[in-house]
């Protein structure tokens, strides 16, 4: 009887190992998807950490997944399953994209998306006097009618190139924000020409700086300028 039970346990173990082996034989996620989120005004849309995303929904599945964009408006995911996906950019400071497209994602799949930003930051200049940084720029709106209210504008200052909302030094960034709370159509030309000042930068340090304009859409999203390097003399 003991021998019979022992043989039974051996057979059960073999069947279990065989079943596990079959499961492990399935291909892993080896497809990739990359591209650019392009501004209709030209160039890549400047984004920030955790803002703009590419939303993907695999055909036949109900739960979507997302690919976060990088600060320079590029995106990439190298661990996707080969399949057809419904794809749309979302979450950024641009007019909502309502039409999804279907992309057959395999190894090395590339696709770019063009969006219309809420606000375009133009003529962005920086000047440093001692430890005080002055930032000047103007704002325009490709589509003014129906634009979400402009809440505020502010500098973003950090010691790394990863600089933006959620990635900045508060004492140089948030405290120097300027409240606007106006519709773009109610702003004068003077309102649209903005000057920000960042005082008391640390001598001998290098900073990375950009500006942003925040709107009252459902994401509280911001449009950003490019990132510039500021070297403060000792």
Region locations from a protein language model:
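Short, ordered, surface-exposed loop/turn motifs in non-cytosolic proteins
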Residues: 41-60, 147-151
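Short Pro-Gly-centered beta-turn/loop motif in secreted/extracellular proteins
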Residues: 76-86, 92-93
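Structured interaction patches on ligand/partner-binding surfaces of diverse proteins
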Residues: 92-118
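Beta-strand-rich modules
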Residues: 189-191, 196-221
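Glycine-centered loop-to-beta-strand initiation motif
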Residues: 35, 69-78, 113
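Short, acidic Ser/Thr/Gly-rich low-complexity loop/linker segments typical of extracellular
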Residues: 59-72
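Extracellular fibronectin type III
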Residues: 217-234
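Bacterial Sec-dependent N-terminal signal peptides
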Residues: 1-42, 233-234
């Amino acid at each position: 009887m003991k021998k019979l039970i022992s043989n039974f346990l051996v057979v059960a173990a073999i069947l279990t190992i065989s079943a596990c082996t079959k499961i492990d034989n399935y291909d892993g996620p080896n497809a990739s998807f990359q591209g650019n989120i392009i501004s209709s005004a030209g160039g890549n849309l400047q984004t920030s950490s955790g803002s703009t995303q590419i939303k993907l929904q695999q055909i036949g599945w109900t739960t979507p997944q997302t690919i976060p964009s990088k600060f320079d408006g590029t995106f990439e995911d190298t661990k996707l399953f080969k399949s057809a996906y419904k794809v749309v950019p979302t979450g950024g400071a641009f007019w909502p994209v309502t039409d999804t497209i279907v992309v057959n994602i395999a190894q090395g799949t590339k696709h770019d998306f063009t969006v219309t930003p809420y606000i375009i930051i133009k003529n962005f200049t920086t000047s440093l006097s001692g430890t005080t940084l002055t930032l000047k720029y103007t704002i325009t709106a490709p589509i003014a009618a129906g634009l979400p209210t402009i809440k505020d504008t502010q500098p973003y200052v950090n010691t790394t190139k990863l600089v933006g909302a959620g990635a900045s030094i508060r004492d140089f960034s948030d405290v120097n924000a300027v409240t606007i709370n106006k519709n773009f159509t109610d702003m004068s030309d003077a309102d649209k020409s903005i000057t920000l000042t960042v005082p008391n930068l640390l001598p001998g340090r290098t900073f990375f700086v950009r500006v942003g304009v925040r709107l009252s859409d459902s994401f509280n999203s911001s449009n950003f300028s490019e990132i510039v390097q500021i070297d403060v003399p000792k």
